[in-house]
Amino acid sequence: MSIKADRWIKRMAQEHGMIEPFVDGQVRGGVVSYGLSSYGYDIRIADEFKIFTNVNSAIIDPKNFDPRSFVDVKADVCIIPPNSFVLCRTIEYFRIPRNVLCVCVGKSTYARCGLIANVTPFEPGWEGYVTIEISNTTPLPAKIYANEGIAQVLFFEGDELPDVAYDDRSGKYQGQTGVTLPRI
């Protein structure tokens, strides 16, 4: 399994729609950077946020998720309460090839502020907008910015095709379009 370089990412995005919209190169200058990098793609977050709160004293249960656990916010910035987290989604829509696995890691700009981006791997054959969890590990409120970079996706090409890919087994998050809550 090898990591894929910018040339491969660009070709797959432009010829196969692997990333839409696709930004060819790094956008910087007053924003948290995003776009194509040497061995990855820096993704952006949309302006839709689910901020978790304890206002209603709900319990987080992945098998019986209570929508009173969060408040919905649509804005250019999101303030994450201390020691809390927010769910958001990417601007980019991904179509992962059958022989590729993607791993997503946080950007250093946010990591140095105590913010952790958590995303499960993008499995072979998966497609959709990526739901991202951003944890504020600090005792202070923290700000994140819509339409700017949040994390980097790394693309690994397998040596052979899997017997069963995500789309073959009708994965529960296939084709997700918004900030998607846990499903069983």
UniProtKB/Swiss-Prot annotation:
Record: residues binding dCTP: 107-112, 152, 166, 176
SUPFAM superfamilies in the cross-refs: dUTPase-like
Biological process according to GO: dUMP biosynthetic process; dUTP biosynthetic process; nucleobase-containing small molecule interconversion
Chemical reaction(s) catalysed: dCTP + H2O + H(+) = dUTP + NH4(+)
Pathway where this protein functions: Pyrimidine metabolism; dUMP biosynthesis; dUMP from dCTP (dUTP route): step 1/2
EC number: 3.5.4.13
Keywords annotated in UniProt: Hydrolase, Nucleotide metabolism, Nucleotide-binding
S-S pairs: none
UniProt superkingdom: Bacteria
InterPro entries the UniProt entry points to: dCTP_deaminase, dUTPase-like_sf, dUTPase_trimeric
GO molecular function, one term: dCTP deaminase activity
Family in the record: Belongs to the dCTP deaminase family.
Function: Catalyzes the deamination of dCTP to dUTP.
UniProt subunit comment: Homotrimer.
Name recorded for this polypeptide: dCTP deaminase
